[in-house]
Amino acid sequence: MSKVASKLNLRQVGRVCVTVADTDRAIDFYVGTLGFEKVVDTPMGPDMRWVEVALHGTPTTIALAPPPQGQGAGGSQTGIILDTSDVDADHAALKAAGVDVDDEVTRFGGPVPPMFWLRDPDGNSLIIVQPSA
């Protein structure tokens, strides 16, 4: 362990942040479509809100935040990976609901699990993966 690391008090990944142009639209997508729960919704200055959503029973949240001043919202590869027990069923359900998903589930084979990408209404990409049992 490095000299710096031994002095730190880090304990978990608490939240990740995606920028969104319309907070209510993002809440509708993450809560209404993906099944997250809204766990934080608080004013952030006179015109903005800080919102966090999480999957039921999980400690890590996704913050749905406005972009920094002068920057656009969304359009990023978030690096967020959501685990599922049935990647094919989730892909079919999201595609049928009109969510922007890849045309097919990607299957690389070997130790790489099946997966597909989806994009939220702001173009932020998330990956849904079915880990090996």
What are these model-predicted stretches?
Residues H56-T61, Q69-Q71, V87-A89:
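Short, charged/polar surface micro-motifs in flexible loops or helix N-caps
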Residues L55, L64-P66, Q130:
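Residue-level recognition of conserved beta-strand positions in structured domain cores
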Residues M1-N9, R15-V18, D41-T42, R49, ...:
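Vicinal oxygen chelate
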Residues L8-L10, C17-T60:
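Core segments of cupin and vicinal oxygen chelate
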Residues D22-T23, T84-D88:
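Helix N-cap motif at beta-to-alpha junctions
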Residues F29, D88-A93:
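Short amphipathic alpha-helices within nucleic acid-binding modules
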Residues P66, A73-G74, I80-T84:
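Helix-adjacent hinge/juxtasegments
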Residues V4, V39, P67-G70:
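Short, P/G- and charge-enriched loop/turn segments at secondary-structure junctions
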